[in-house]
């Protein structure tokens, strides 16, 4: 079918579809889901099981190992990592990156079945294993509800719950999570002396309250035709009921609990998590939106709702925006419109300057139709607007006009030779239609590995491929339909009598090309030398994995030595908070203690329930000040907190590992692992640029152990469990049961009234009771007390113990270069015993996995490109000539990065992939034209020079518009390096296409001037 001819004959049909593209594009932009970043599925689940009283070794052997063994038999399991603490097992299951999203819910169901299977094999006293598969939920709209000292935690909690209840009703809201709520408890304070005087054992209180407060089934009774449920109601309704509970002493006397104990409300101490916002106690409120919704619109509705609710809040309570994804997405879309307008203006202006005003309007209109059609099709494919898809439009901007440029240039050249306008526009589009399609497909195929690569990092940029594929295919269709239609009434070119190429510019180019062809071997050798030189320079250039984003935020993880409690963490973070709030550039400071906050940013790391951990989120007034303030904060902490480990960072789009550089040593013996890790740490200490050097297991923690004696214990009638219960009552409180108040459950804790005054010395004299009510001290039931230092955690990787030597790069130090220096030194310094191995983790692991994922589909891409070339050119030599041009783009890549000062990173690699397609696309246009002229009977040398001369404008315009269209992205923190890569590479590729490719072609075909 002759599409150009059909477009002119059926103009009304084409006009209709063009109107649909514009209207659909406008509607698509208004209704497409908008988010800050592309959504990618975090294919991991977290398993948690508590085993109170067990050491990390016991937790590992009795809880972690059985669960891991069962889970490992699951389908598509990629990694299993675990951490065994005192009384707690944490296991993370990561699925194969290639797992389709549709299979994940089924796999998590299978995981739960595996957990149910292993539960009966866990030791008595182990809790039920909880499975959290919503690990990757993002609460991108994040607030902090803070109060001054005049409010209780209950009042703060009530208001937080009220806001949560209101927020879940907003259309588009999926979940609302609260963070930092304090757990209300009922404390029963007793004096051991009083209990001894009244002859009441702690076990009596435990048994009595546990039996009285439990809900039991009392059965049912048939009465005539009615089945009557029998209900027993003896649970505590008020604290007075609890205080009135009767206890029977060893002598048989009865006493009220309130007579021998103090019953009062309180909060769990120490708390598991805490939060502060701008120096005030707070509760975090994270809002997660549904997939595909317009977060800008949903966020506006949330802000409107909260504005009305905050007006009802009491004085002294404040709601602070901590991270507004809706505002960030709105700004990104506004920036996109500006960048898009700039790119369109640049592209059209260049075309107008070179090809004329009418040609500029003609080609520029095809650009708008391509963008509108892409937005329309994105709706049907379920794609949304985000940082990656918007960048895809900017990247595609220059390439979208390539096909229209070729068609328009062909038509103009034909009209210059006297052809009728209708004939010129039809033949100008019809003649190169297959070569343009092939070149378009090649450009799309070059980005194909991004879409197919099975890795979370590659998944981030998949929308970029979708945008490019849709828009480029549309541009080809429009070049055969809209361009001839518009060109038939817009193009006006006066025929010229002579050769249109007989100008000063073309004559100068002919002389240059003749010289290049005459010195062909020298040209080839020079270009080869430049290629080798560029590879050498590339090896010396700084490289990075993912760039930092230009947000007015930075965050910091704070870690104290293992063994510190959350109150120690609080004291340190309060001082840091005071310093940060005193900085004039700082707008808001929020802190979480005990764990990271809800995942408000997709690429955030998650750390749960560590009392020695804190996280700080700092917002600044101006994003240009972020790096300077972060650097000052690092210096302040380093100078004033010698025991604190701090890792602050700007925001990145990749998941953040525990450390940038990690060498993991795998084996069985803890002492051997620690020795191997210590050697690697010594290397890090000696290497300039390495900071935050640490052991992944942390420091050994102090342990105090009463050595229970069965002989002594049996003689006085005190069991090991009774001794342990007595210590628990004196140190943290023993759980008696739950007090229910509405929908709230409060633990009832039995505590020694002197709970805060015990130390390791007077604990030895702690009174304990035997069954007859007699009182003894702990030391009477033990063979002494042992004080030791042991690992506070045992970490495993795929069911093997792993200990990591970790570090981060210092300020201004390149991660890749530091890793390369460390890797060589560690390999030399660490001798691995038999049965032990070393594995690289950290950013290098992520980068290697991402690169391997991309490389997995590179052969497919090359095969597809080769097939297209063979179909177009129908021989072998011409495809080889074209493919030989690909490695030479490295010359331009190095030039672009060096001139702009950018670092080669993951997005530069994406740009490199795109360059392959762009370069081949330009080369195809030239090589096919050479073949056409040779087939028409022209002398090979004349065909070579004439084809090159005729393709200068289309090739230069296609490359020039792409290069200049990249300008708005050059200053983007995320895609700047990719823009520099494409701009530099394409500039050199253009020169190669019009200067070097003819030389290589002449060498392959032995073409010489007659």
Residue ranges of each PLM-predicted region?
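Hydrophobic regular secondary-structure detector
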Residues: 1-110, 114-115, 272-624, 632, ...
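A structural signal for conserved, well-ordered secondary-structure elements
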Residues: 4-7, 12, 30, 34, ...
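Extracytoplasmic/periplasmic membrane-proximal domains and adjacent transmembrane bundles
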Residues: 6, 48, 119, 166-345, ...
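Generic hydrophobic, helix-prone segments enriched in Leu/Val/Ile
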Residues: 122, 131, 135, 160, ...
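Alpha-helix initiation/capping motif
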Residues: 152, 386, 503, 622, ...
